[in-house]
C-alpha cells in the first residue's frame, strides 16, 4: 500500500513539474514573440501533453500534422543567414522556418513524447526533384527496419524506400553521426557533437535562449 501511495505521489509531482515547465515556456515565448506566438505555444504544449498515451505511430502522425501547418521560409529571408538552426521555442514563437527547423521541432517533440532517441534520426539529404538540400526526420520501429520519413514537404509519412526523391547524405541524433550509403542505417562516423550547428542549437534549447528574426515574413 505504501509503495502504491509513493508511486502516486511521484506521478503527481511529475505532472506538476511538467505543467510548471510548460507554463514557463509559454510565458517566455509570449513575452518575447507576442500573443499570437503564445497561442501557438499553448497548442504546442497541449500536443505534448495530450499525445502521451498514443501509440508511437500515432505520435508520429500527430507531430507531423501539427508542425506541417507552420509556414516555410528560408533562413536568408527570415534570419539573414545562410544557415540557422532554430530551436523549437524559436520555431513555435515565429511560426515559420525552413526544413531544418521543421525537422528539429518534430525530433524534439517526439523525444518529449517518450520515443527513444535510438529510434530517431535527423537526415540531411538531397531533394532530387527540387535539386536542393533538405532535412527530414526518420523513425526506426526496429533497428534493422526501413525507417519512416517525416517531411514538411509531404504530409504522408512514408517508408524511406518509397521516397525516391530523397538521396540521404548523412544523419544524426542526440549522440551519433552516420554517413549514409543507402536508405538504411548508414555507417557511424563519430559523435553528433562534430556538428557545430547542432551544438549551438542544443545550448540555446537548454537555456531557452531566444533570438528575433531579422525580417518579418
Q: Where do the language-model regions lie?
A:
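N-terminal signal peptide c-region/cleavage motif recognized by signal peptidases
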Residues: 14-16
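A structural boundary/capping signal
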Residues: 18-217
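Secreted/luminal cysteine- and crosslink-motif detector
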Residues: 11-12, 100
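Sec-dependent signal peptide recognition
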Residues: 2-10
Amino acid at each position: 500500500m505504501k509503495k502504491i501511495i509513493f508511486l502516486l505521489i511521484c506521478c503527481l509531482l511529475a505532472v506538476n513539474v511538467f505543467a510548471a515547465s510548460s507554463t514557463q515556456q509559454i510565458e517566455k515565448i509570449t513575452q518575447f514573440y507576442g500573443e499570437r506566438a503564445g497561442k501557438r505555444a499553448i497548442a504546442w504544449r497541449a500536443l505534448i501533453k495530450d499525445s502521451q498515451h498514443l501509440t508511437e505511430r500515432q505520435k508520429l502522425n500527430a507531430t507531423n500534422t501539427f508542425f506541417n501547418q507552420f509556414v516555410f521560409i528560408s533562413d536568408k529571408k527570415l534570419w539573414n543567414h545562410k544557415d540557422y538552426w532554430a530551436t523549437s521555442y524559436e520555431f513555435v514563437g515565429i511560426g515559420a522556418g525552413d526544413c531544418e527547423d521543421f525537422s528539429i521541432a518534430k525530433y524534439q517533440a517526439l523525444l518529449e513524447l517518450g520515443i527513444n532517441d535510438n529510434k530517431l534520426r535527423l537526415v540531411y539529404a538531397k531533394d532530387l526533384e527540387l535539386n536542393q538540400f533538405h532535412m527530414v526526420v526518420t523513425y526506426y520501429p526496429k533497428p534493422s527496419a526501413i525507417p519512416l520519413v517525416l517531411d514538411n514537404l509531404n504530409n504522408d509519412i512514408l517508408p524511406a524506400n518509397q521516397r525516391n526523391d530523397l538521396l540521404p547524405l548523412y544523419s544524426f541524433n542526440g549522440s551519433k553521426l552516420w554517413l549514409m550509403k543507402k536508405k538504411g542505417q548508414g555507417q557511424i562516423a563519430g559523435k553528433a557533437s562534430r556538428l557545430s550547428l547542432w551544438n549551438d542549437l542544443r545550448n540555446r534549447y537548454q537555456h531557452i535562449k531566444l533570438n528575433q528574426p531579422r525580417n518579418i515574413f
